[in-house]
Amino acid sequence: MCAQPVANTKEVRWQKVLYERQPFPDNYVDRRFLEELRKNIYARKYQYWAVVFESSVVIQQLCSVCVFVVIWWYMDEGLLAPQWLFGTGLASSLIGYVLFDFIDGGEGRKKSGRTRWADLKSALVFITFTYGFSPVLKTLTESVSTDTIYAMAVFMLLGHLIFFDYGANAAIVSSTLSLNMAIFASVCLASRLPRSLHAFIMVTFAIQIFALWPMLQKKLKACTPRSYVGVTLLFAFSALGGLLSISAVGAILFALLLISISCLCPFYLIRLQLFKENIHGPWDEAEIKEDLSRFLS
């Protein structure tokens, strides 16, 4: 009579269910318990040079901030004429506009329905209003101490780098917030320049380097990757050269930062990928594959 339950236990096949009573102890583990275990089935295999290429977006934005600060310092010290900066920026914007339109082939213009004349009018309206409000921008923060202005500018530029759209699908990404923080930093720094003309040109330059330049970067990266790499290298060396003219120590530290982001970080990412171990099985939460947007409208 005592051996009968044991025989039944061997004959009954264990099932992975909780709604049936089974002749097994609560801590029983069957051989088939982990037969559906899968590891790293959705893991992406990264290649070193591909990661280096993607890191160039971060390099570009760091260099943009560096160039902006260097240009501001040159204008504040009286080493750069505002007329020269305005002319150079205007010519660069025109070249970038033509290059963007050439690479894009007019597809973006067709989708948006905008014409070249509409773009020209928008540019003229922006320049006119910015020039008209430049005296206000110059005197906007007169009652605020210079140290506070510099601290605000630093925090705004850091926020710009944090919230910038580097191509990642993350909740923290906000292109609008990133651009607004960069413009706010430019207004803060422009208010400490000698004249209203300096403030006007500084804000205009901020729009060019923080709003227009990233658009051309993305287009070059998507359509002409080799040209994009060349532009990134040229831009990085230009930023380093400008920073070197101000501070050798700062240029060395900035160069180490760029090398770490573009070379060391991808290397460690590839190395750490060997230790990645995500497990998947029947215990995973159910995923709804069907598009439910029609029920939400």
From Swiss-Prot:
Keyword annotations from UniProtKB, A to Z: Endoplasmic reticulum, GPI-anchor biosynthesis, Membrane, Transmembrane, Transmembrane helix
Assembly information from the UniProt record: Component of the glycosylphosphatidylinositol-N-acetylglucosaminyltransferase (GPI-GnT) complex composed at least by PIGA, PIGC, PIGH, PIGP, PIGQ, PIGY and DPM2. Interacts with PIGQ. Interacts with the heterodimer PIGA:PIGH.
Membrane topology: Multi-pass membrane protein
Keyword Repeat: no
Protein name: Phosphatidylinositol N-acetylglucosaminyltransferase subunit C
BP GO annotations: GPI anchor biosynthetic process
A Pfam entry, by short name: GPI2
